[in-house]
Amino acid sequence: MEINKIYNEDCFDTMKRMVSDNQTVDIILTSPPYCTPKDDARKNTPKRFKNHDVFYDVFEGFESPEFYRKWTVELFKAYDDVLEKDGVVLYNLSYSTENPYLAYLCIADVIKYTNFVVADCISWKKNSALPQNRNSNRLTRVCEFVFVLVRELELKTFRTTKEQYGNMQNNYTNLATNFIEAPNNDILSTEVNKLNNATFSTAFVNELLKIYAYPNYTVYDSFMGTGTTAVACKNYGCNYIGSEISKAQVEFANKRLSEGLYSMKKPDIKCLF
């Protein structure tokens, strides 16, 4: 299997090929599609997304929350087949106003029905909260979660780059925390929003890579979208593999990678914390 490539296909097909080719990855870093019911996916929702009709250009949603939960379990079973020993899954999953508890049910199902458990939960504070919640009793969500999932048998051995200097009694300054501040996304353009209205930023991915990746690691994004994970990996010195069902998003991602669009300064790996 070719690395440093985004495959225009369903992620389950990509992972089946990984297994057949004995291709493994060190990190899985992704944000799955929202659980938008199929009958609502093509409806205009002006209160939440001004000038945008849908989240994605191709994907039309899931049949039901119950289906989404089962799909999540199958996804993590597939992850188990391609993730290296002591590897990590960095799963950016937030909750919605319509179904605020679904994300937690999905993670609970993963713990119950797969080999994975939650090792950490990172809070990502965005620079703005969009869409703003106009519900009478709900908060506007400026933070999202990144669930750090590892195999239960590897809970004490999974890999990070984290170095703690001193000990808990006399040195707190160099301790890595579960809090990240990073922009929502790289760009706010009509072109990208029509393709994918739920992207994250290269700065966000870079913060995660600083904690869990070394150069030459291979990172897999099962929902690559417009290529943000690939761009961040390229800058960081990691290899990447991506899956994306939207041909238009793959083409846009390849354009970003070839032209260096929306990239960032390569980090100093020696000064992580």
Q: Residue ranges of each PLM-predicted region?
A:
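Conserved phosphoryl-transfer catalytic core
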Residues: 51-58, 259-273
